[in-house]
Amino acid sequence: EGIGFALLGANSGNGGSIIGGQGAMVRLDGSIDPAGPRVLFVQLGSDGATLSGGSRAGQWMLLDQLVDEVRGRIPATSPMALLTPAGRQTLARYLDGGGRIAVSIHRAADIHQLLRWSQRQGVRVAILGGAEAWKVAPQLAAAKVPVFVDPLANLPGDFDQLGAGLDTAAKLRAAGVQVGFTPSDRAPHNARKIRQTAGNAVANGL
């Protein structure tokens, strides 16, 4: 129904890690060749807190440790090491601007923390969800961080999304942020509705 390519993502499951895994752009014309580089998916905020001992602060501690392991500040032989050899090799591709990390996150304070972390670690990020991203739109534009929003997500589904609104995409674009669309439920069978939700974004100021 007019969908020529898709970004296949990896989701963090119950009992898993805030690092969901890798995904990539794929073509839907029968070609087996990828349509773009790989992307690493990370879950932060209240949803990620359930995967990090119930602590938002614990998420950043874990991320910093993973980076320290890749950069050799924590030896691979350390009993405290979290990454496997394959994990270190994979994460290394995304450091110092070598790849894009897509972060599922909503709350403005968490997004602000993500921007500080990404700048400190030299990591390129994109935001999935971003219900309150409009509150830090100038910072996102300056950092050239794209945001993928659900134009229909206008309800405070949890305390991370109190600032959700139908005009989120319009506010972000007005500030110079690159905007894309994604369904909140991430259901692949709803990919065909992306054009409809784009129309909703236009109807609300985009």
Please give the residue ranges for each predicted region:
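Catalytic beta/alpha-barrel core
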Residues: 102-107, 124-132, 152-158
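Glycine-enriched alpha-helix->loop->beta-strand junction motifs that scaffold or abut catalytic
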Residues: 118-125, 141-148, 176-178
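Short secondary-structure boundary/capping elements
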Residues: 83-86, 106-109, 132, 160-164, ...
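Active-site environment of divalent metal-dependent phosphoester hydrolases
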Residues: 13-17, 108-112, 130-137, 155, ...
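Hydrophobic residues within beta-strands of alpha/beta enzymes
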Residues: 6-8, 147, 180
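Polyanionic/metal-chelating signatures
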Residues: 2-125
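His/Asp/Glu-enriched, well-ordered alpha-helical/loop segment
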Residues: 100, 141, 150-154, 159-206
